[in-house]
């Protein structure tokens, strides 16, 4: 995608097909429920930041699936089911995945919020210094505390192994009990900030 084509995009559906990495699209990282006149369209600089962030998200997706999805024990032993019952349930699951266009058994990483324009950031109550404004941050959906901790551990291990820097890894929980992982990587000046936060 060229810089000039980014400037002409005006709707999130037009962003959906633009790939930032093998498993993440520009549409995923720019989606918002906030209705603003600017359409939440990132600049070419923001897109480069999102690509850098997606490099980490690809590592997270790959390692999480290798460790916790693809190498699970035989579920029939754990669930006390006969293999026939489990097999019919697995077939049903596979058919529904196929209907969604998924040809693998891997679990996706789901992004709640990525890039935010100033108008979107204001509409959702984001802080003025948010890494979302520059395309350097993503809020990642998790199913609960266990997945939150596993995601955080994978990203911390990757940083330790490679020496790659990140800015923020925030394990967040709101008043209603929902968890998510806020993760940010800047082009430079990363702080390696790790916190548990209640919002």
Predicted region positions:
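Short glycine-rich, low-complexity/disordered patches
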Residues: 64-72, 105-109, 164-173
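N-terminal cationic-hydrophobic initiation segments that often serve targeting/anchoring roles
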Residues: 61-65, 100, 156-160
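Active-site microenvironments of hydrolase-like enzyme catalytic domains
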Residues: 124-140
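Catalytic cores and adjacent binding grooves of peptidoglycan-active enzymes
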Residues: 134, 142-199
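A cross-taxon signal for low-complexity, glycine/charged-rich
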Residues: 73, 79-84, 91-106
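Serine/threonine-rich, low-complexity intrinsically disordered segments
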Residues: 4-5, 10, 27, 72, ...
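Extracytoplasmic cell-surface/polysaccharide-interacting catalytic and binding patches
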Residues: 1-65, 192-199
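Extended, low-complexity, intrinsically disordered C-terminal regulatory tails
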Residues: 54, 58-67, 107-125
């Amino acid at each position: 995608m060229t810089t000039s084509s980014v400037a002409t995009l005006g709707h999130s559906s037009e962003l959906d097909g633009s790939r930032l990495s093998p498993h993440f699209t520009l549409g995923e990282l720019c989606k918002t429920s906030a209705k603003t006149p600017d359409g939440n369209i990132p600049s070419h600089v923001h897109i480069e930041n999102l690509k850098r962030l997606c490099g980490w998200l690809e590592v997270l997706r790959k390692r999480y699936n290798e460790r916790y999805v693809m190498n699970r024990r035989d579920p029939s032993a754990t669930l006390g089911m006969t293999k026939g019952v489990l097999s019919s349930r697995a077939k049903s699951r596979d058919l529904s995945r196929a209907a969604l266009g998924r040809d693998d058994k891997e679990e996706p990483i789901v992004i709640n919020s990525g890039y935010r324009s100033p108008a979107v950031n204001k509409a959702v109550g984001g802080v003025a210094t948010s890494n979302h404004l520059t395309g350097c941050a993503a809020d990642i959906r998790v199913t609960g505390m266990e997945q939150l901790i596993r995601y955080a551990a994978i990203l911390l291990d990757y940083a330790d192994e490679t020496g790659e820097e990140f800015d923020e890894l925030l394990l967040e929980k709101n008043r209603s009990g929902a968890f998510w992982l806020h993760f940010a990587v800047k082009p430079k000046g990363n702080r390696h900030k790790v916190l548990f936060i209640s919002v």
